[in-house]
Each structure stands twice: as structure tokens, then as C-alpha cells.
Amino acid sequence: MNWTAATCWALLLAAAFLCDSCSAKGGRGGARGSARGVRGGARGASRVRVRPAPRYGSSLRVAAAGAAAGAAAGVAAGLATGSGWRRTSGPGELGLEDDENGAMGGNGTDRGVYSYWAWTSGSGSVHSPRICLLLGGTLGALELLRP
């Protein structure tokens, strides 16, 4: 996993934890019975509702934890093996993908868009971190605009 992808995952995780509201109250909300001024409300007896704590937290936290675990594993694997996860073939050597394209009736996709190597290796075109900043800014702005 390259540093751009790791940065995107880290920003997504940070936005998930910052945007998840801890003070959200479920149910009907408000102090329904005691708002009328009579102790116990309209029914004449006070009721105590105890809600159990959520078992796993919000689904957003679970998804963010999974994303963080995947990002951490990818970064750890990338650091353990060096900058790229696969050794590039030298001049005159055939790589894994060259064999299938050189054979008669091969798929002919080469190392283009459809190549797994092009999507997973750290080499190739380098994307700018603008998309990460845009994603983080959008998530932050949505949290600020929320009532």
C-alpha cells in the first residue's frame, strides 16, 4: 500500500471518529413526562428507563475500525517488504504478466488499467493528495453544517 492510500485511510478514520456524535439520543427524546410540571408526568408514577449500552457502538465506528485495521496491515506489509511488494523484472527478464500476454491467444491487456499490478503496486502514476484533502474537508464541512 502506498503512502497516498495510507493517508486517505488515516483521514477517513479520523473523520469517522470526529464526525460520530457521542451525544446523540435515541428514542422519542426530551423529558416527556416531567415537562408538564407534575412529578411523574401524566401517568402519576415516575418511570425509570434504563437503556443498555450498545454492544459494538455505532456502525460507523465498526467500519472505521475495520478500515484502520486494513490500512495498518497494508502499511506494515509495505514497510516489511520495502517500497514495493513485488520485485520488478529487469531488462530481458519476463515477468508474471508478460507470459500471459506473449502467449498465443493472450488477453492482451498488458500493464494498463486492467492490470492487478498497476492497481496494487507503489510504482506507476503518482496521484496527488488533493482527493484526500477534498474528502477530509467535505466530511468536516458536513459535520459543521449538521443541526
From Swiss-Prot:
Species assigned in the record: Mus musculus (Mouse)
Removed propeptide positions: 123-147
Chain positions carrying an annotated carbohydrate: N107
Misc. comment: This protein is a candidate for 'Pi' factor, a PrP(C)-like protein able to compensate for the absence of PrPC in mice lacking Prnp.
Biased composition (Gly residues): 26-43
Role of this protein: Prion-like protein that has PrP(C)-like neuroprotective activity. May act as a modulator for the biological actions of normal and abnormal PrP.
UniProt modification remark: N-glycosylated.
Family from the record: Belongs to the SPRN family.
Tissue: Mainly expressed in brain (at protein level). In brain, it is highly expressed in the hippocampus and cerebellum and is also expressed at lower level in other areas of the brain including the cerebral cortex, the thalamus and the medulla. In hippocampus and cerebellum it is highly expressed in the cell bodies of pyramidal cells and Purkinje cells, respectively.
Signal peptide range: 1-24
Protein's GO biological process: protein import into nucleus
Residues with lipid group (GPI-anchor amidated glycine): G122
GO cellular component annotations of the record: cytosol; membrane; nucleolus; nucleus; plasma membrane; side of membrane; vesicle
Full protein name: Shadow of prion protein
Membrane topology value: Lipid-anchor; GPI-anchor
One term of GO molecular function: nucleic acid binding
Subcellular location, record wording: Cell membrane
InterPro entries hit by this protein: Shadoo
Protein keywords: Amyloid, Cell membrane, Glycoprotein, GPI-anchor, Lipoprotein, Membrane, Prion, Signal
